[in-house]
Amino acid sequence: MDESALLDLLECPVCLERLDASAKVLPCQHTFCKRCLLGIVGSRNELRCPECRTLVGSGVDELPSNILLVRLLDGIKQRPWKPGPGGGGSTTCTNVLRAQGSTVVNCGSKDLQSPQCGQQPRVQAWSPPVRGIPQLPCAKALYNYEGKEPGDLKFSKGDIIILRRQVDENWYHGEVNGVHGFFPTNFVQIIKPLPQPPPQCKALYDFEVKDKEADKDCLPFAKDDVLTVIRRVDENWAEGMLADKIGIFPISYVEFNSAAKQLIEWDKPPVPGVDTAECPSATAAQSSSASKHSDTKKNTRKRHSFTSLTMANKSSQASQNRHSMEISPPVLISSSNPTAAARISELSGLSCSAPSQVHISTTGLIVTPPPSSPVTTGPSFTFPTDVPYQAALGTMNPPLPPPPLLATTVLASTPSGATAAAVAAAAAAVAAGVGPRPAVGSTEQIAHLRPQTRPSVYVAIYPYTPRKEDELELRKGEMFLVFERCQDGWYKGTSMHTSKIGVFPGNYVAPVTRAVTNASQAKVPMSTAGQASRGVTMVSPSTAGGPAQKPQGNGVAGNPSVVPTAVVSAAHIQTSPQAKVLLHMTGQMTVNQARNAVRTVAAHNQERPTAAVTPIQVQNAACIGPASVGLPHHSLASQPLPPMVGPAAHIAAVNINRTSVPLACAAGASSLASPNMTTAALETEPSGRTVTILPGLPTSPESAASACGNSSAVKPDKDSKKEKKGLLKLLSGASTKRKPRVSPPASPTLDVELGSGEVPLQGAVGPELPLGGVHGRVGSCPTDGDGPVAAGTAALAQDAFHRKTSSLDSAVPIAPPPRQACSSLGPVMNEARPVVCERHRVVVSYPPQSEAELELKEGDIVFVHKKREDGWFKGTLQRNGKTGLFPGSFVENI
């Protein structure tokens, strides 16, 4: 081993300065310079090994010197270097290695002929420089550049440009003939790159230590502080230095520069059962999949990397590969702060992809998705080592300059190397046999478009009781942040409610994706089907408007331009073979009716936040008709829709009085007073009536009439056809402005019996906003891909019960074997609890901390249907019809 390589190893792991004879060795056999040890004792009043955190009982002066280090240093000083055959012995290679600053001094033309000097990697690391090129970091111009904006550096082809700093992967700041300015990266070839900055990180959040005695190993810092990264301790913690203090800190609280990312990736402990080959390199240069030539180092830093943190007085020979004089390997300890470790989830893709930023607060955990597209970069020009330099220059044309500096600015909080693709789950429009169905990929196909190492949000669709200590308890509707998907079907993640970290079966949860919708497309949220393609599609709220379509033929509407989306609740995701269809009511109603409709909302039996998305307001909605349907993922293939079959329910009137049942349907196209709610206007006389709706019994299209807005008398005679047609005139939605109706489910036939004084209407249904004291949802979605199903009931009553069939809480899966793929799911029917609502007024505004929470404004009226033990309420906001969680201290009972 020559002198240069040996001296690179003899540096302090803390300050990265060269060790000398005054360095001390600790009882754990780790060696550090005396200055660093004295600084640790002065700041913390105790001495712990920065590598393994072992407490040292003796003082710094009492520690022994490293005998091996002293002998190595003495041997280097006393070893004479033989001059080369051409003379020049007065200049030794040691002088080269001790050169300070960014300038590297050559041994001279005679010394370069020396065998000893010729073996030095620092001198021979690059090909012999062209004559006249300074030994500073420099580049050679490939083309003429005239400059596009003031401050740009103008140069001609062949000019040698001295590099001062790298602004981002597209721009450099350099100097030519004493003139400074900016120039694009793809106009030059880097001959000698800039020295890599030290491994540092920038604090994204404040990290405070409450119990200083218990958390004395932690390194507190404030937002925007710059820390020097020393090493990675475990999966969630790293060790660093701030000023003269050394300690550990959570990885998810900081953003690393390129050098620190490489260091963290090197120190990352191996995870059994996880394919680490899917994680790309930490450097952004490898994303171009070009040559591995050293010139690609120019792309290792983004604009938001900490290039300004480069130490100007740092020697260019300072290697980033830190090595300590350790005889035994350091002991990797777990977090000394279990409370803090439980709150911080691991972001395993820190250097691999764009992780979601996790904002931890006292009220919830918000997951902010990464940017949808990376920064546009210009083409990079790299040359293989076997291609002659002049030949490569002659075969290239001038490239297009990259975007200007201001156009490519990236926020500092954006993770480096953000390459997350924007996944848009387009929905299929329900058409009466007209037009093909747009192709939509399944959840698994969509998941492959995103980086596999990015933490994903999942929702529990079945409860699971842990059997081992490292397993998590799953409660239906609970949100989880998954950051590892093991090969045996188990997931590792953290609960967004309890912040506990553990493993759980993968087929008990479903991914939550956000679909991007437009007003010009049909909005149909994808339901779940099977176990391999489960998922919840959360549709972003937007204004859905457009002209209504006129009916075709027997009152069946044509292909509408807008199909409003339904509310997708995480607590009602159906993964059985018959996936449930979620609908919400459409039509017009008065303000009082809208308020009354909100008073009774289905109370779902879960204790933790669920993913709820507000429905989208519909302009020119139909009087009565299905608002939206859920499609199984596998049924969203690129194939045409089957033609309409007609109403999807057979209505049998039982014990109906001979009094008339007026049904008021406003045909106008005005929006509701409630901005995010659409319901059907229903008025009925109080009388004892019982109507049974039998979904699954198909009826002919001729049974759909085209009358709406008038009152009709239903008489219980033996002519059932006349009765059915009389009701279907009002219930089929066959008006001048309506949505198309879809085919009935294949199986099974489900009955919903409604109490006295109720008139359920097929077609006027809603998943969260029924009109009376009853919320009945029936029907299932077939898995044979024959189209979605619209079926359900809603009625006017104050004292009734709530029953759901084929809903999520009635399906109990079979417990999975230990650490193996879970078995199939067996549905079991069950009944829910009746709905109890209380009116509350908001006294203090509350901003939501997650999508499962409600935004409260002072003076709002909230209908509370559940009060939890932890002080949180679940209710529906009267202002917009949203259902969610909120702290009970922000409202008062009225």
Swiss-Prot record:
SH3 domain: residues covered: 134-193, 196-259, 453-514, 835-894
Domain of life assignment: Eukaryota
Pfam families in alphabetical order: SH3_1 (PF00018), SH3_9 (PF14604), zf-C3HC4_2 (PF13923)
Low complexity bias spans: 281-291
Subunit details: Interacts with HERP1. Interacts with RAC1; in a GTP-dependent manner. Interacts with MAP3K10/MLK2 and MAP3K11/MLK3. Interacts with MAPK8IP; this interaction leads to the PJAC complex (POSH-JIP or SH3RF1/MAPK8IP apoptotic complex) with a 1:1 ratio. Interacts with SIAH1. Probably part of a signaling complex that may contain SH3RF1, MAPK8IP, DLK1, MAP2K4/MKK4, MAP2K7/MKK7, MAPK8/JNK1, MAPK9/JNK2, AKT1 and AKT2. Found in a complex with RAC2, MAP3K7/TAK1, MAP2K7/MKK7, MAPK8IP1/JIP1, MAPK8/JNK1 and MAPK9/JNK2. Found in a complex with RAC1, MAP3K11/MLK3, MAP2K7/MKK7, MAPK8IP1/JIP1 and MAPK8/JNK1.
Skewed-composition ranges (Polar residues): 306-322, 700-713
Pathway annotation: Protein modification; protein ubiquitination
Molecular function GO labels: MAP-kinase scaffold activity; ubiquitin protein ligase activity; zinc ion binding
Comp. bias (Basic and acidic residues): 715-726
Its job: Has E3 ubiquitin-protein ligase activity. In the absence of an external substrate, it can catalyze self-ubiquitination. Stimulates ubiquitination of potassium channel KCNJ1, enhancing it's dynamin-dependent and clathrin-independent endocytosis. Acts as a scaffold protein that coordinates with MAPK8IP1/JIP1 in organizing different components of the JNK pathway, including RAC1 or RAC2, MAP3K11/MLK3 or MAP3K7/TAK1, MAP2K7/MKK7, MAPK8/JNK1 and/or MAPK9/JNK2 into a functional multiprotein complex to ensure the effective activation of the JNK signaling pathway.
Species the sequence originates in: Rattus norvegicus (Rat)
Reaction(s) catalysed (UniProt annotation): S-ubiquitinyl-[E2 ubiquitin-conjugating enzyme]-L-cysteine + [acceptor protein]-L-lysine = [E2 ubiquitin-conjugating enzyme]-L-cysteine + N(6)-ubiquitinyl-[acceptor protein]-L-lysine
Ranges where the record places region Interaction with RAC1: 293-363
Family to which the UniProt record says this protein belongs: Belongs to the SH3RF family.
Region called Disordered, residue ranges: 274-323, 526-556, 682-751
The protein's name in its UniProt record: E3 ubiquitin-protein ligase SH3RF1
This protein's UniProt keywords: Cell projection, Cytoplasm, Golgi apparatus, Metal-binding, Phosphoprotein, Repeat, SH3 domain, Transferase, Ubl conjugation, Ubl conjugation pathway, Zinc, Zinc-finger
Free-text domain note: The RING finger domain is required for ubiquitin ligase activity and autoubiquitination.
GO biological process: negative regulation of apoptotic process; negative regulation of extrinsic apoptotic signaling pathway; neuron migration; positive regulation of JNK cascade; positive regulation of proteasomal ubiquitin-dependent protein catabolic process; protein autoubiquitination; protein ubiquitination; regulation of CD4-positive, alpha-beta T cell differentiation
Processing and modification events after translation: Phosphorylated at Ser-305 by AKT1 and AKT2. When phosphorylated, it has reduced ability to bind Rac.
